[in-house]
Structure formats: C-alpha cells, structure tokens
Amino acid sequence: AYAGNAAVADNASVVATNPALMTEFKKAEFSVGGILVDADVDVAGTIGGVPANHKNVIPNAIVPNMYAVVPVTERFTLGGGLNVNYGLKSEYGNQYAAGVYGGRTELTALNFNLSGAYDLGYGFSAGFGLNAIHSDAEVERHLGIGGKAIARQLQAKATQAANAGQAAQAAQLNAVAGQLANMPSNTSVSKIKGDKWSLGWNAGLTYKLNENHRWGLAYHSAVNVKFKGEYSNQFPVAYNALLMRLAASGVSLPISQATGGENVPGSLTLNLPAYWEFSGFHKITDKLAVQYSYKYTEWKRLKSLTAYGNSGNTLFHKDEKFSNASRYALGFSYNANDALTLRAGVAYDKSASVNHPSISIPDTDRMWYSLGATYRFTPNLSADFGYSHLRGKKNSFKEGLSGQFKVTSKANLYGLNINYRF
C-alpha cells in the first residue's frame, strides 16, 4: 500500500520517492519492473431520461519503471530513474448517450529523473532531483443524445418566433433543429491532442535515529504543462455564423468554433499538482517492522481543462474543480528468513474530485489492501512481488442539467520488480 514510501530504502525506487534515501545504499543497485493495473469501473445513469450505462470505462494498463543508484563517495550518491508520474485514462464508446460528458480522456506523464543525495551527518541526509517530464494528452467528446436534445430547444424557439411573426427566424431555427436531430450520436464535438516536455524538481530529507528507526519527508514540485496541439470537431463551418445568434436566444451548442472536421491549432495548460509525503519506519524486533505514510497532494491547482485557439478564443472547456487530497497508509514487513521478506498494508485514498465528480474522470474515495514479498535469489539478485486490491466508494452525482450517474469502482494491481546489486 506504499506505506513508508519516504522512509524505506528497499530498492533503487527511492529515486522516485525520496532521493535522500539513496545514502542508505553502499553498493550500486539497478531496479526494473512494472505494475499491471486491472481496473473495473462501471457507470450507470441517465441523461435526458435516456439510459447512459457503460461498463469498464478504465482500460487496463502497464505502468513501467526503471531506477539506478550509484554511490560516488562515502557521503555522496547519484541516482536516476524513469517512471510514470501521473496517468489517467477513461474511454467511453463513441455512441455513448452522454458522450458530451464522457468520451476519451487520457493523460500520461513520463518522468525522467536525475538525483543526488548527501549524508549530512548526525543521522541526517538530504537529496535533490531534477525531472524532465514528457506529457501526452488527448480529450475527445461526442454528441450522444445532445443533437436531439438541442433540436427540441430550437423547435420551441422556432414556435415562439413564428408566433411573434418572425417567419424567417423561425424557418432558420427549424432548419438547424432538423440538422441537429439527424446528426449521428458519434459526431465529434471536440477533439484536442498534444504533447509537451516540462521541467520539475523534487527534494527529500531523512533522519535516522539508528538502524531501527528512520523518518523521511519528500516533496515533488508542481508542473505546468503547456500543450500545443490540434483541435477539431465535425460540425459544419457554416454553424460559426449561427453560434452567437443561438446563444442570444438561450440555446448553446456543445462547440464554440465549428471546424468541419479540419484541424486547427489549439493549446491547453494542465496544472499538475505538487505533493508532500511524510513517512516513518520502525524495526520492532529482529523480524518485524512497521512503516506508515501521510501524503498530501495539491490537486486544487487543477480547476478546469480549457483549450484555446490562436486568437484566444475558447475551443473546449470542462470544469474539474479538484480539491486537495490526503492519503494515509500503514504497513508491516516480516523477515521470514534470510531469503524471504513478507509484507502487508492498508491505505485510505481520498478522491480529489469529491466536490465536483465527473464521469470523464470517475474518481472516488478508495481503500487499498496490499500483500507483497521480496525474495533474494542471491546476495545481489532479488525480486519484489506485490498485489493490491482497491475498492472505491460508490458515488452518485449529477452532471450538467440532465445527467444523473452512479459510479462503482474496484481494481487489482499486480507489481513485479527485479533488483540487482553490483
């Protein structure tokens, strides 16, 4: 359950968790592995009275990692690593009824880290790292039942115009209503895709009272990712002349600029959060140890997903209104013999979207239940095995004017790392 992440120096992955822990290594070590994420997230609901159910909205994924730690002197250690800092993906079918809220949402932030650590003496060590982050993002939404719903609004406005003697306006509104009513549900209303390199940093501090007791504090900086990419939708460009007129009549289309399927330049700034983590490690007996962690992530920086055109016009906007979130973890490790260490832990993970849930990122509060083991084949070669079961809290909420949804979630994580000490 990642308990003790900032205070436990089991393998070279400390490069990513707390670089100050690298001073615990007296020999060079290399670690490579990954985690298979097998998620089961289902959405049940309605939009405008139409069923909007979707199963398995989070595809399975493999999350890789690779780290190395190299002592340079008795006090100074270098390290480097590759890992996924942030990753999320949800995918609904392109004919999903609530496609304007839940289509395809994907973000992957691949982190390349170079760190150094120094033993300050008196039990203290400090570490600092630089991060080069390559981020890929893609957001796509579809019309779903939106075309028919907007068509009904336009027909009502057309009737009002006709009754007021405005025959030309009524005819135009009815014509647009007919086009929208006949648009397929898989019509793309927005698609933006881009990638970007960004820079960040991380730092850590540890205090070791003795070989049996250690505390750690780690910090990872916020990163502002300024994507430049391409935006498109499948609405005819002739609609651009109607957008302001329709908005003035109280009817809004799910686009702010029609592109007719052509790509136009677009940009999107994604504010990834900073986080703090405090951890402790205590060896109670020769065989048994306890570790714990508190992690605070500043998700409040992520207020919305907004894409802009070259002239500053809004191409896509989605409120997220994330809140800062906390995570609590407690774990135990048991040295069964010289070759085998067993581990178990639990964690409570607070959702960042608890105050503004959305089916695009169907997050909920969740519990972690974890088991793991380290097996040492030789004094230099070992393998870490881990399994976690995540169970999310059921979450019912409204989205937009007519969407009502309930999200149920669980996941199984399977991890394997191979470690070699030189």
Give each language-model segment a name:
Residues 15-21:
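N-terminal periplasmic accessory domains that precede
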Residues 5-10, 48-52, 61-422:
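Outer-membrane beta-barrel porins/channels
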Residues 21-23, 68:
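A general structural signal for short secondary-structure junctions and capping/turn motifs
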Residues 19, 34, 82:
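Residues immediately flanking
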Residues 1, 23-42:
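Transmembrane beta-strand segments of Gram-negative outer membrane beta-barrel proteins
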Residues 43-44, 57:
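Glycine/alanine-rich phosphate-binding loops at beta-alpha junctions
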